[in-house]
Amino acid sequence: MTEIAAIHAREILDSRGNPTVEADVLLADGTLGRAAVPSGASTGEHEAVELRDGDKSHYLGKGVLKAVDNIESVIAPELEGMDAANQRLLDATMIALDGTPNKGRLGANAILAVSMAAARASANSLKIPLYRYLGGANASILPTPMMNILNGGAHADNNVDFQEFMVMPVGAERFSEALRWGAEIFHTLKGVLKKKGYNTAVGDEGGFAPSLSSNTEAIEVILEAIELAGYKAGEDVAIALDPAASEFYDKEKGKYIFKKSDKSEKTSEEMAQYWESWTRQYPIISIEDGFAEDDWQGWRYFTELVGSRIQLVGDDLFVTNTERLQRGIEEGIANSILIKVNQIGTVSETFEAIELGRRYGYTSIISHRSGETEDTFIADLAVATGAGQIKTGSASRTDRIAKYNQLLRIEEQLGQTGEFLGLEAVNFGE
């Protein structure tokens, strides 16, 4: 019986040493479901609210005791006795309890922890894997990894304006092979950077953050590493970018300012042309947040320019939110949506965003946050939804590797029924 008997929550630490929320959902049959929520460094303005205490004497104001208390004193009394397997009703009940458009009263971190834990408890009670519980009998697609191996922007102290440079092993035949290729390139890149005298410490997501001289040098060292590892750039392995352009957009000037590199300023049209020239010069197949979250005009121009030949992903633009995605669909903006469960705050709404995108030909990429935990929910979510792509960091740091290892286990469980789409998972706007 999947009836909820008790809900408990606690304050734990994420991969950056900041507090986050973990929830336990205990069912009447004694089954436990546990989930921990992640948090982001570069967050979109339109994301659901992550409730922090603001008490400087407790974790420098970043505590989440209010969110924990909201679970135990507000959410638990309402949900206890309900069926954990009725995900939509549980999530709708918590949304109604909160009563704000952005989950600002109870906190998306409180609501999401319970939403995920309930799903896991139900799967455990039914003795089926989480991906099977969430995705049904046909869930069999393993995602192509987008591995963030080099960092700039808000994730690094260097002269690189763009936040993430990723490799996608699109030519691999199965997930485990793609992961191996990515790991080999990551280790080869370390050697390339060392040889050039650069620091090889890793950032929040396990990628290197050396003091490179420019944005182009970042791409060039990756291309060198791909080749040295024995792979062909553009054929075996492609490049994906997440510039996180909101971080270097000046709203007052209405311009993109390369503050960290050459201090140049670009209008939206010039920025679109800049990206277009990069896609001609380098084997780039996906650009996420190439424009600021509210620069709809820039996004439109960009989509018209290159949307028919590369994947254009909205993260800060859409924030896993169906209303913003609907606007993007109507205006012909982007062709892919990044899915971060904590941007919207419930499992049900996450599925709704993926389904809406799919209806209009938008791909989905399941994503981690820079502040992660050992929770592997998103690995199962990627398979459950058949998203075909996952973004969960580099080939280092246990908080990232945990997701990859879970996908290796799922690949093993699926056996011959498992599918790996490689390049086919990526939307070229066709």
Curated annotation (Swiss-Prot):
Q: Per its UniProt record, what InterPro entries does this chain match? A: Enolase (IPR000941), Enolase-like_C_sf (IPR036849), Enolase-like_N (IPR029017), Enolase_C (IPR020810), Enolase_CS (IPR020809), Enolase_N (IPR020811)
List, separated by semicolons, the cofactors it needs: Mg(2+)
Gene Ontology terms describing biological process: glycolytic process
Q: In which pathway does it act?
A: Carbohydrate degradation; glycolysis; pyruvate from D-glyceraldehyde 3-phosphate: step 4/5
Q: How is the cofactor bound?
A: Binds a second Mg(2+) ion via substrate during catalysis.
Q: Which Pfam families match?
A: Enolase_C (PF00113), Enolase_N (PF03952)
Q: What is this protein called?
A: Enolase
